[in-house]
Amino acid sequence: MTTTAETVRTAGAGRDRWEALALARAARLEALLGDPYDPANPHGLRALFAADHRRTPPAATEALLDGAGLAAEFVPVEYGGRLTRADLLARTLRPVFRRDVALGFGYGITSLFATGPVWAAGTPDQRRDLAELLLGGGRATILHHELAHANAILRDEFTARPAGQGGLRLHGRKDLIINAARADAQIVYARTDAARGPRSHSVFLLDPTRTEPGTMRHLPRIETSGMRGALFSGLEFDGRTLPEDALVGRAGEGVALALRTFQVNRSVICGVVTAAADTVLHSAVRAATTGRSGPVARRWHKPLTGVFADLLACDSMATVALRALGLLPDRAHVLAAAVKYVVPDLLRENLEELSTVLGSRGYRHGSPEYGALDKLVRDLPVAGLGHAGTAACQAVIVPQLRTLAESAWFAEDEPPPELFRKGAELPPLDYRLLGIAGGGDFMAASLVGSADRLAPSRGVGGQITALAELAEAFVAELRALRETCRRLPPYGTSVLGDPAVCVLSDRYSLIAAAAAVLGVWEGQDGTDPFLADAAWAVLALSRIGERLGIPVPELPDGCAAYVLDELVRRYRAGLSCDLDATPLAQ
């Protein structure tokens, strides 16, 4: 890949132009990929499903993405790429994930996840060389247990041991690494201290072409049940010399770098995978409307409107977390874990609901119109969106709960309104500024502020009264959670093994989701009448409240019908079912 005019424009643009340029690139990519339902489109769903069935990457579409310079999206603008803000990155990548999660991971987003430690703590030479590699069409891969699980690097899969003549040698094996056989850079988390603790691991940036004979062995490809077109295989190291310039950051900084950079990975994953669920929702609306001259059958109203509201809630939560990475970089780590905790669970539930609408159509595996459900059900767990990821997020959230209850909830100031305001100019994502300790809880403060502002509307009636009552119900739940969390044992005890304690992270994360919905609704400027109306927020909050088991008011008259009308309108107009209502290729 060579430097493109778009890359040059991004590098020279001010913050006021970043969003417009990113949305233009996303629109161009959507157009290049073409109508996903056209059977003759080499980048359409039929072709992508066929590649998945063959268990091969879609070569033609990867070549198209190469030509579009997509790899530049993973390189910070200061090093010649297009990466400015995390929320804009997610919006740029959605056209790819809307069609195929495996393509999104296999083509390049893994490079973003792998290179985070280098952008956070690498030397100027490491950053420059890595940027040059990615901009030239190269790939990077990450070597630890899972793509997105911060706790998994603590397992002794790789060790860097002192060599007799000085320096370190890498040992260990991992059987399941995405792009292991075709990566041009390897970012390895290896144990460098036998003692357990936060200084046990270090990060190394390796060039696979600089390996001595006999010290690195490629292991066979492993076929997975999901993301079948992605290339998973293994690597085994037996005394591979680690050059002095391979260490990223300081020795023993690996765990801290993982915790800092994985908050980007978690938020980006959730920000893009909603686009894949959007495709399934479009399939369900197609199933519910095809062959009908009248309105959608009543039995499908609840699953269709409910999933639509959930997708808007997921997008709200992910977008707020992504924006916080730039605006509040030292305070976003708990929210990022909460997003990764909530969004996959909601999406799994949504797919189950949509399967009832699709019925037997959902088993037409190769059908572009209806095959997305089956594929996404298989892809999500392999993409790190299964139950193991939930445990990793609990490991981030639970240790913070007592401190937040004692010092942050109902005591902290609200975040800047730009966090929720569409079109606001925000600082860039700077990996070097990301924090992992303390920082309070700006989402809880936002929830309390939203409820206070809505309180005078509780007697007005209609949607706004329902919204005010829901906001107050979530504040009451936060208050109850505070009392429970104040009684937790101090950090460092074995509370993570207690199921009752882990449930608290579920309650907290759903409260954070509600805060995001309210914040995004309040941040509307009126340019989108649907999002400015309270109906979608009322429905989204009602579903979150039902999951929490808190009192939920009856939906006001016309609420669900208004949301359903918007969903059908978007389907017929070819618009996405997220906060952006993006025009889709047709």
Where are these regions (language model features)?
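Glycine-rich beta->alpha junctions and the first turn(s) of the following alpha-helix
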Residues: 224-312, 421-516
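Amphipathic, small/basic residue-rich leader segments at the start of a protein or domain
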Residues: 1-108, 129, 435-496, 505, ...
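Glycine-rich flavin
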Residues: 48-181, 198-199, 326, 389, ...
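C-terminal effector modules of eukaryotic transcription factors
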Residues: 509, 518-525, 530-532
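Short, charged, amphipathic alpha-helical segments
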Residues: 298-301, 333-338, 367, 528-538
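Extended amphipathic alpha-helical segments with heptad-repeat/coiled-coil character used for oligomerization
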Residues: 321-417
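Alpha-helical transition-metal enzyme core signature, strongest for iron centers
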Residues: 274-277, 281, 304-318, 343-354, ...
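A short core secondary-structure module
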Residues: 173-217
